[in-house]
Structure formats: C-alpha cells, structure tokens
UniProtKB/Swiss-Prot annotation:
Known role: The glycine cleavage system catalyzes the degradation of glycine. The H protein shuttles the methylamine group of glycine from the P protein to the T protein. Is also involved in protein lipoylation via its role as an octanoyl/lipoyl carrier protein intermediate.
Domain Lipoyl-binding: 22-104
Descriptive protein name: Glycine cleavage system H protein
Modification sites for N6-lipoyllysine: 63
PROSITE patterns the UniProt entry points to: BIOTINYL_LIPOYL
Required cofactor(s): (R)-lipoate
Superkingdom of the source species: Bacteria
One cellular component term from this protein's GO annotations in UniProt: cytosol
Amino acid sequence: MAVPEELKYSKEHEWVKVEGDTVTIGITEYAQGELGDIVFVELPETEDDIEESESFGSVESVKTVSELYAPVSGSVVEINEELEDSPEFVNESPYEKAWMVKVKLNDESQLDDLLSADQYKEMIGE
C-alpha cells in the first residue's frame, strides 16, 4: 500500500503535502480502500475557512458516507473541481488526481501534530 514518504498524515487518514505556507489535502490509499467505490465528494467553497479537527466535507461510497476532517486550520484557496464529475479518482489515484483542497495555513505549527509516513504506516498496521 502506498504511503508516500514526503507527505504528512492525520489520524483521520488525510494526507497533507506542504508547499510553503500552503498545503494540499486528500485522503489516503488506506482510507479509500476502507470506503470502497467512491460515488460522490462534497468539498467546501474557495475562500471558506476550515478549522483543525472540524469537518470540511464528505466522501460518499457505495457503503457509507465519511466526513473529511481538517488536519490544519486555514483558508481554502483552491478545490479539486474534477472530483465533482469524477469521484472515482479518489479510488484510482488518491495522491495525485484526487487531491481535494489547497489551504493557506493559519498556523504552521499545526503541521508538527501530524504523523510522518512511518508513524502512519505503524498506525494502520503496515
């Protein structure tokens, strides 16, 4: 199972790619595998503020609906509009095509609370 080393991870199975004071957020390969076939993704609007540990959207699969929890606080600067028409990208390419939001960080120190790839692998039993 892919757990890219350059990313950070939340305990709620979101991945975070850090690019200066902006982060890109998506869900992990492990999470999409647990959810099954993704049929709908609900994301916030551009310029919405999201708060660490609070829901900022949801992913619906044939089995269930799962909330997305913000690993950091900040302002949404971009959403992946392709997921509206192609939610299956979450299953096919969770780390590339299926990024969900880009967020301008409010507090970079929140990144210190996230897991490394090795810590995340340990958490999911890899």
